[in-house]
Amino acid sequence: MITLEKVCFAYEHEVALRYIDLHIEKGESVIIQGPNGCGKSTLIKLLNGIIFPSEGYYFYKDHEITEKALKDRQFAKWFHQQMGYVFQNADTQLFCGSVEEEVAFGPIQMGLPKAEVRERTEDCLRLFGIEKLRERPPYHLSGGEKRKVSLACILSLNPEVLILDEPLAGLDGKTQDMLLTFLKDFHRAGKTLITITHNRQLAEELGTRFAVMNEEHELKMV
């Protein structure tokens, strides 16, 4: 489903990824760990099509993912519907005037009928228990509430792959338990998870395969 072949990436003269080989099958839950600065966040930005390999190849469902490929609007629309990326800092992906508008934004951009937009929006608000926040501006919410909204936004697109960067960081215990339960359910539904985390409980309960990045910006499966 997802294949990286000898992928390298550098910011100007600073290497961030060094000859990464990775293959992820549909329905796997891959945990990525490693020290700060080893390239983990760069790797998931590349998987989400935000940046592209300096060397090597990235394939998703046998399609090579390149900057040129994602300039095709139809292909880019398909790819970004497949890939759900939840940033560690939810503020970077919340920009609408209300929670309801935020959750509905993706389905509207997909061109879905109004009835389906409403249904997806209501389902996702209800799933994360944020129905009562629907009229609130996202910037007025707590960190945990923002994380729930950002996940609701991604789930409204019904992605095949969910990519998360430290999803439990900074959350209270109750919210952590709720999100962990959701992620387990998402995975049990046959979807694919790729998660960066230092949280041992999350890794042990969610991971089916484990990858470690080192200070040389290399990745090894363990």
Mark where each language-model region is:
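Helix-to-loop junction immediately C-terminal to a conserved catalytic motif
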Residues: 48
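Conserved ABC ATPase "signature" region
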Residues: 115-133
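Conserved ABC ATPase signature
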Residues: 137-141, 145
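The feature captures the beta-strand-to-loop junction immediately N-terminal to the Walker
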Residues: 33-35
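Conserved ABC transporter NBD signature motif
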Residues: 56-68, 79
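H-loop/switch region of ABC-family ATPase nucleotide-binding domains
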Residues: 197-198
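Catalytic Walker B motif of ABC-type/P-loop ATPase nucleotide-binding domains
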Residues: 162-165
